[in-house]
């Protein structure tokens, strides 16, 4: 939210207050779901610091982690009405408004982060989505970052897709995650995230799927001794700014914000890439056995789900899927 300072400045000068202690010209807010120990927060801190430095103190960004301002849907609405300035959202999250955007979370459709970038910025589908974010939702996309890839932990080794059969797999209550479990032959078991550790510990479920950072943060490795690198859903994170905020900034400060967001996204991506490499070593030291099943049968098992997606989303969904599949290696 823009903070108007002209009146304050005039008043301060009349009272003899030094300009050195005056507030920034633009006092902005960045809301996010992630907590203070997360890579997202660390990258947002870097973003805020660079913006302040490069704007010579004209822009001050305060961070609001841990869903203090609501969930991601609520924060996107706040960006639209101008009551919040910045937030994060995954590309797939825009399925809330455009069902075809769920393509970003279809298991095995986005094979790596390079594909994720091309899917968003190079395909006609991606370019159109960015335009709709701007026109319909009142948000400008500043940059995209890698945010981890979902893997599968279990109480038995997963060496091939055959080992998934009958596995009671905890998943969030989201269509794409439920579909992953269902079509690879597991038994999907939706459950609140806060309940997962105990469910794994008591064998109420046999496994779960999450990015490696979440596996470590929640200490699932204490109660699951097998980790299969299933690479089934790649997550990204978009740096978003309210159009109302962005358009009120002078052109030179818009560039400061844009450049800082791109730099923060690179740092964000590095944190996750380096972190995932380190975490594999960490889990091995904790006695977790890492397996690398052949993923070709996993992807092949998703064909019925892709057909279901196309049926639900029509020509837009079909076009999105074809365009992204065309850039997969």
Swiss-Prot record:
UniProt xrefs under Pfam families: DctP
One of the protein's GO biological processes: transmembrane transport
InterPro entries: DctP_fam (IPR018389), TRAP_DctP (IPR004682), TRAP_DctP_sf (IPR038404)
Key words of the record: Periplasm, Signal, Sugar transport, Transport
Cell compartments where the protein resides: Periplasm
Signal peptide feature range: 1-23
GO cellular component, one term: outer membrane-bounded periplasmic space
Binding site for N-acetyl-beta-neuraminate: 33, 72, 90, 150, 170, 210
Top-level taxonomic group: Bacteria
Free-text function comment from the UniProt entry: Part of the tripartite ATP-independent periplasmic (TRAP) transport system SiaPT involved in the uptake of sialic acid (N-acetyl-beta-neuraminate). This protein specifically binds sialic acid with high affinity. N-Acetylneuraminate (sialic acid) can then be incorporated into the lipooligosaccharides (LOS) as a terminal non-reducing sugar, protecting the bacterium from complement-mediated killing by normal human serum.
NCBIfam families according to UniProt: dctP, TRAP_S1
Quaternary state and interactors: The complex comprises the extracytoplasmic solute receptor protein SiaP, and the fused transmembrane protein SiaT.
Family affiliation: Belongs to the bacterial solute-binding protein 7 family.
Name assigned to this protein: Sialic acid-binding periplasmic protein SiaP
Organism: Haemophilus influenzae (strain 86-028NP)
Lineage: Bacteria, Pseudomonadati, Pseudomonadota, Gammaproteobacteria, Pasteurellales
Gene that specifies this protein: siaP
């Amino acid at each position: 939210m823009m903070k108007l300072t002209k009146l304050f400045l005039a008043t301060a000068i009349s009272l003899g207050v030094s300009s050195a202690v005056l507030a920034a010209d633009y006092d902005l807010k960045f809301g996010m779901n992630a907590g203070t120990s997360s890579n997202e927060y660390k990258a947002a801190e870097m973003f805020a610091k660079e913006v302040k430095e490069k704007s010579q103190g004209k822009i001050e960004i305060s961070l609001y982690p841990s869903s203090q301002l609501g969930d991601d849907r609520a924060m996107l609405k706040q960006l639209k009405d101008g009551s919040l300035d910045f937030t994060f959202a995954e590309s797939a999250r825009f399925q809330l408004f455009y069902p075809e955007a769920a393509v970003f979370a279809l298991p095995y459709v986005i094979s790596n982060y390079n594909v994720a970038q091309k899917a968003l910025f190079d395909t006609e589908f991606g370019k159109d989505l960015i335009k709709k974010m701007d026109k319909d939702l009142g948000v400008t996309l500043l940059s995209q970052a890698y945010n981890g890839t979902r893997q599968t932990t279990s109480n038995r080794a997963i060496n091939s897709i055959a080992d998934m059969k009958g596995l009671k797999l905890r998943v969030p209550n989201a269509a794409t995650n439920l579909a992953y479990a269902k079509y690879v032959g597991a038994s999907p078991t939706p459950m609140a995230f806060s309940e997962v550790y105990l469910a794994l510990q008591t064998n109420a479920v046999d496994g779960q799927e999450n990015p490696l950072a979440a596996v470590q943060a929640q200490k699932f490795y204490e109660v699951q001794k097998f980790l299969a690198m299933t690479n089934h859903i790649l997550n990204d994170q978009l740096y978003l700014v309210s159009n109302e905020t962005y358009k009120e900034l002078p052109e030179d400060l818009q560039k400061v914000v844009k450049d800082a967001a791109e730099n923060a996204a690179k740092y964000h991506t590095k944190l996750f890439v380096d972190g995932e490499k380190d975490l594999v070593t960490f889990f091995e030291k904790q006695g977790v056995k890492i397996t690398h099943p052949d993923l070709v049968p996993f992807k092949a098992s998703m064909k019925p789900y892709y057909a279901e997606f196309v049926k639900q989303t029509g020509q837009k969904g079909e076009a999105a899927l074809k365009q992204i599949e065309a850039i997969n290696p």
